[in-house]
């Protein structure tokens, strides 16, 4: 390593990498005397310099460098020094930081030609560690003509992390395919796999998806951190009313309960929390899933396998011969599965499942479109929970401000009402948000709604029947805005179809 690189690594960066890169500014603190140094380029926005000064709390010594020099110093300067990061890096036997490892990797274009693939393994371990530390749900590895792009999805939003040298693409992709037991020679078709890892002493399930593109394969890693999942209804962010109503529904002896929402809206977590609540020695609880995301002790879990014709419908039929009390169907995707689920609920089983619809009432028409007769649906359905995930405000930097009249009118609140707004600080990577919380709409199927379903009434007619007893998903979001948990912009972002 060069003397200049060694000197830079002695400096600890204060700003998150993504912010430092996008604003082209480095705020560095020397380890031994805590002095600060700022490195930027000619195009660095004045606002970024002011933000660096605000964070530092003092005047700064600014050094302007060329774009090329800034990129080099950006990569080699990022050392993670938190206790958690050090512990996790030690656990995986990795003495260097993710960004430094990228700089230090050997110049090899083909993993199969390398005598030692330990450096690339360390890089993947460091990348996974970095993703877990940032609470990322997905890692995107994208190959373009001139560069390789690595992005993390954090709190539902993609965030650029690093642009390593282009030649690392084949190294990373090949090694990941080996770890996921995929065919490394096959680069023409998409492949799916999974791997179970321990990173920093934590059990991580990783779903791997590869896709050919015009400049090489793209890879997406879905991270399932078994230590971070909240399998408790009281920890899902539901209002007290919705939580109590859902708790009463799942303790009914038979019927269907559905959870709806787009991909990544937390449906599986809600269902797992419900199963954990019901899990007891006197109940036989069984699931059919695609895939099994989290293993639940005391619950029989079966995974769909289309290669051997093990579909949701076939798995559900087999489960019903296993004397179950409660059945979880990971997703109702077709009419056959829907019909079997309805029949199961009518023969003394409690059935939990998910549907990809935008609203709770949309689940009713979707099931009828799948061929479920209205009289069967009205008899079997207990309730539908629609949900989304919104980012929560960072508790370290959010600030209350009076809402302007235009937004107040949109929200239906009094002008001047104090609402918390995102600001941005190092704790939240300058996004203003940290973590996510659910917003929900729970529709209970009462006698009036059953009669409407039996008559094949539309969603609007059923909404009128529910009237004021129904709290829509957007109204629940507004309640969380008023409580200072999130922002109206976040609620609108995830409920645009409302």
UniProtKB/Swiss-Prot annotation:
It catalyses: ATP + H2O + cellular proteinSide 1 = ADP + phosphate + cellular proteinSide 2. Zn(2+) binds at residues 394, 397, 425, 428. Gene3D superfamilies: 3.30.450.90, P-loop containing nucleotide triphosphate hydrolases, Type II secretion system, protein E, N-terminal domain. Pfam families: GSPE_N1E, T2SSE. Its EC number is 7.4.2.8. ATP binds at residues 261-268. It is an enzyme of class 7 (translocase). ATPase component of the type II secretion system required for the energy-dependent secretion of extracellular factors such as proteases and toxins from the periplasm. Acts as a molecular motor to provide the energy that is required for assembly of the pseudopilus and the extrusion of substrates generated in the cytoplasm. This is Type II secretion system protein E. The gene is outE.
């Amino acid at each position: 390593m060069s003397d200049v690189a060694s000197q830079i690594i002695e400096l600890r960066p204060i700003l998150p990498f993504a912010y430092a890169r996008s604003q082209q500014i480095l705020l560095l603190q020397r380890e031994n005397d805590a002095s600060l140094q700022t490195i930027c380029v000619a195009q660095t926005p004045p606002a970024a310099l002011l933000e660096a000064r605000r964070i530092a709390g003092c005047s700064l010594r600014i050094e302007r460098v060329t774009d090329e020099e800034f990129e080099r110093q950006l990569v080699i300067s990022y050392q993670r020094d938190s206790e958690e990061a050090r512990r996790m890096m030690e656990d995986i036997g990795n003495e260097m930081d993710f960004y430094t490892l990228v700089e230090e990797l050997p110049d090899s274009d083909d993993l199969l030609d390398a005598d030692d693939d330990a450096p690339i393994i360390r890089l993947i371990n460091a990348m996974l560690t970095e993703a877990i530390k940032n609470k990322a749900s997905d890692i995107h590895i994208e190959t373009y003509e001139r560069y390789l792009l690595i992005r993390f999805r954090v709190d539902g939003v993609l965030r650029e992390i690093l642009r390593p040298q282009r030649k690392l693409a084949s190294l990373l992709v090949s090694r990941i395919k080996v770890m996921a037991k995929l065919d490394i020679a096959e680069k023409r078709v998409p492949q799916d796999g999974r791997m179970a890892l321990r990173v920093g002493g934590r059990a991580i399930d990783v779903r791997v998806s590869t896709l050919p593109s015009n400049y090489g394969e793209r890879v997406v890693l879905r991270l399932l951190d078994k230590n971070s999942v909240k399998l408790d209804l009281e920890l899902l962010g539901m209002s007290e009313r919705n939580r109590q109503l859902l708790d009463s529904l799942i303790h009914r002896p038979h019927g269907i309960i559905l959870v709806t929402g787009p991909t990544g809206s937390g449906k599986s977590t809600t269902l797992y929390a419900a199963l954990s609540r019901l899990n007891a020695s006197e109940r036989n609880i069984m699931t059919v899933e695609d895939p099994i995301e989290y293993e639940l002790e005391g619950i029989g879990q079966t995974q769909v396998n289309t290669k051997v014709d093990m579909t949701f419908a076939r798995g559900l039929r087999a489960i019903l011969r296993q004397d179950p009390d409660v059945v979880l169907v990971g997703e109702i995707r077709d009419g056959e599965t829907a019909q079997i689920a309805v029949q199961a609920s009518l023969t003394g089983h409690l059935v939990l499942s998910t549907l990809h619809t935008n609203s709770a009432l949309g689940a009713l028409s979707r099931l009828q479109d799948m061929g479920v007769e209205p009289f069967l649906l009205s008899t079997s359905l207990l309730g539908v929970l629609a949900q989304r995930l919104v980012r929560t405000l960072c508790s370290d930097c959010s600030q209350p401000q009076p809402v302007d009249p235009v937004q107040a009118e949109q929200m239906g609140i009094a002008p001047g009402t104090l609402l918390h707004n995102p600001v941005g600080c190092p704790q939240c990577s300058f996004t203003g948000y940290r973590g996510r919380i659910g917003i929900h709409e729970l529709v209970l199927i009462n006698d009036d709604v059953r009669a409407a379903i039996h008559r094949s009434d539309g969603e609007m007619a059923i909404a009128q029947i529910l009237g004021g007893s129904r709290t829509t998903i957007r109204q629940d979001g507004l309640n969380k805005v008023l409580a200072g948990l999130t922002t109206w912009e976040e609620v609108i972002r995830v409920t645009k179809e409302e």
